[in-house]
């Protein structure tokens, strides 16, 4: 990452308050579509599962997931599907074509393969999910809704994150961060010639998240990407509210990861100083 790119400072915006809307995880329209299996859905299902880029990913696309993708197409959020951008144990991310020929990212969570016990640990204590049951499907659907809500809240707080577009069951559609050729590189994948500036931006993003009542929970050089002169924070699915019983431990871990990375880049920083900066005189407190 060369100096010619520069790093833009985040635009100051009014941070959201401490209100948290309850998130519904009841059956979706996709569940109904999967149950009824009409002819149009069956045709869509056959086309998608026969596509070359999806033939090796059959475990991801059960009927309910295909119904969710079908509903997203019907609603105009997705017009065509491309190949995978990344694959993981719990979710795959695919490039897709959205309205007006814009590229979007489609994140598909595997309900059967997801570590729902770990997911539940992040959901418990979140006021948006009070009374959430123990069903695996409900946990994963809540996680998808949570990721979209976290992205939306972070954007309102002035943090550069992918814009959430739509959710349907275990699928999240969001802004694609990258070029026609490839996804944006992670901070840990590039040479940073201006690490002090990058550190200041990341520190400010962490502060804005905290002031908005959120803690990333897994922040490191691998959950920050560089795109068009900006640092973009990604993977907010596990982000918790400051009211979460483990919020302090998650915040301390984020501070340790960020300080360790920038310390290796020659920046004079330490996790205690970063933690103090984030929490002292904040508009919220853990």
Where are the predicted features?
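Haloarchaeal acidic low-complexity proteome signature biased toward cell-envelope/secretome components but also
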Residues: 1-64, 267-286
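C-lobe/activation-segment region of protein kinase-like
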Residues: 2-3, 210-216, 227-286
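A short, mixed-charge helix-start or loop-turn motif at secondary-structure junctions
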Residues: 51, 131-137, 188, 240-241
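Conserved ATP-binding subdomain of kinase catalytic cores across diverse folds
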Residues: 58, 62-183
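Active-site acidic catalytic loop and adjacent metal/ATP-binding pocket
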Residues: 88-97, 164, 201-238
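Short acidic, glycine/proline-rich loop/turn micro-motifs
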Residues: 119, 184-189, 243-245
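Conserved kinase catalytic-core helix
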Residues: 135-161, 187-217, 221-222, 260
């Amino acid at each position: 990452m060369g100096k010619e790119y520069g790093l833009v400072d985040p635009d100051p915006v009014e941070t959201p308050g401490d209100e948290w809307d309850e998130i519904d995880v009841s059956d979706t329209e996709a569940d109904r579509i999967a149950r009824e299996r009409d002819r149009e859905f069956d045709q869509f299902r056959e086309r998608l599962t026969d596509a070359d880029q999806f033939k090796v990913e059959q475990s991801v696309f059960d009927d309910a997931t295909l119904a969710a993708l079908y509903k997203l197409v019907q609603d105009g959020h997705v017009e065509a599907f491309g190949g995978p951008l990344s694959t993981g144990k719990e979710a795959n991310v695919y490039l897709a074509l959205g309205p007006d020929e814009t590229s979007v990212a489609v994140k598909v969570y595997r309900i059967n393969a997801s570590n729902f016990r770990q997911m539940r640990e992040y959901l418990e204590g979140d006021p948006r999910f009070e009374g959430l049951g123990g069903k695996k499907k409900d946990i994963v659907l809540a996680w998808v809704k949570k990721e979209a809500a976290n992205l939306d809240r972070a954007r309102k707080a002035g943090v550069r994150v992918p814009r959430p577009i739509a959710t349907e069951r275990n699928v999240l559609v969001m802004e694609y961060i990258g070029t026609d050729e490839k996804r944006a590189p992670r901070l840990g994948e590039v040479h940073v010639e201006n690490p002090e500036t990058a550190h200041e931006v990341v520190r400010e993003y962490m502060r804005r998240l905290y002031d908005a009542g959120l803690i990333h929970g897994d922040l490191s050089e691998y959950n920050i990407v560089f795109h068009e002169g900006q640092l973009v924070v990604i993977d907010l699915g596990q982000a918790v509210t400051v009211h979460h019983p483990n919020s302090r431990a998650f915040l301390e871990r984020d501070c340790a990861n960020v300080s360790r990375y920038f310390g290796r880049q020659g920046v004079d920083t330490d996790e205690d100083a970063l933690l103090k900066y984030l929490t002292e005189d904040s508009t919220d407190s853990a």
